[in-house]
């Protein structure tokens, strides 16, 4: 287990560990416990470790070769900010079929890696990523299937604060791995700036 990237209470305050009342066999290894009300709770240390692993993996790519997507409303602003901070390409909102597979489509792009906010709501992007043979990094909750996911980050992928914090951490760690930020340097904007304003 790696050292925590931020204090435990900050992870807890953002609700990263709050899962759902369903679980899949794929996600079982990331579950810490089940509450008396049947809600599955994710292991924050495993989330932390997967953010580190995903950031290291993404840092092997040029920002322009990374595509981050979110159909889910609460993920759209975090994805936008992730792109602004790292230089990655983003598609917040509806993913148009053919974006990765149809060269005749006006907005056709050829990324080398996909970052998805939710394997279920971003399934079209993930299907196309698999069709063209690029790896998929995804934020995954307790009920997600990982069949088409190469690197899963176990997290509450429905929570506004949780999604924002994970994308903030990914951006920070990515820039640290690239040597753009020093090992102990933070982004010049707080995680709250990644949140969808309501």
UniProtKB/Swiss-Prot annotation:
SUPFAM superfamilies the record matches: Ribosomal protein S2
GO molecular function, one term: structural constituent of ribosome
PROSITE patterns recorded: RIBOSOMAL_S2_1
GO biological process: translation
GO cellular component: small ribosomal subunit
Keywords: Ribonucleoprotein, Ribosomal protein
Protein name, entry field: Small ribosomal subunit protein uS2
Organism this protein belongs to: Methanothermobacter thermautotrophicus (strain ATCC 29096 / DSM 1053 / JCM 10044 / NBRC 100330 / Delta H) (Methanobacterium thermoautotrophicum)
Lineage: Archaea, Methanobacteriati, Methanobacteriota, Methanomada group, Methanobacteria
